[in-house]
Amino acid sequence: MDPASPVHAIVAEREEDVISIANYIIHENASALAPACYLQDLFVDPAKRGAGVGQALIDWLVGEMKTQSWSTLYWNTRENNYRARGLYDKYTPHSGFLRYVIKNPAT
C-alpha cells in the first residue's frame, strides 16, 4: 500500500499463515479536532474464531488510538452478527445509529 494512503491493514499470523486481517482508514473528523479511525473490515479465519485473535487486533487499534491521538475508533456490523457483537460489546455498547448507503451504479 502507498504509505501516504489513509487506508491501512494489520494481520495476525500463526506459523507463517495469515489467520486474521483488519483494514482500517484514518480520516478527518468534522466533530472533533483529531482524526478518527474507521475499522472497515475485520476477518478471522473461521477455524481460529473464538481464540482471541480478533480481540488482539482491536486491542492493537485501541493502543494506536491512544498513541496517535485519534479522536475515535469505530466500526459497523450487521445487527444479526451476534458472534462478532459478543466481541464488540466487550469494548463499548453499540451507538444506536443506523447506516444508510447509496451506491453509485456506475462503479
Give each language-model segment a name.
Residues M1-V11, Y38:
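A short helix-loop-beta-strand connector motif used in the catalytic cores of GNAT acetyltransferases and
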Residues H8-A22, D45:
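Conserved beta-hairpin
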Residues A12, G50-I58:
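Glycine-rich acyl-CoA binding loop
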Residues R14, Y24-S31:
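A conserved beta-strand-loop-helix scaffold within acyl/acetyltransferase catalytic domains
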Residues L42-R49:
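A short, internal acetyl-CoA/4′-phosphopantetheine-binding micro-motif in the GNAT/acyltransferase core
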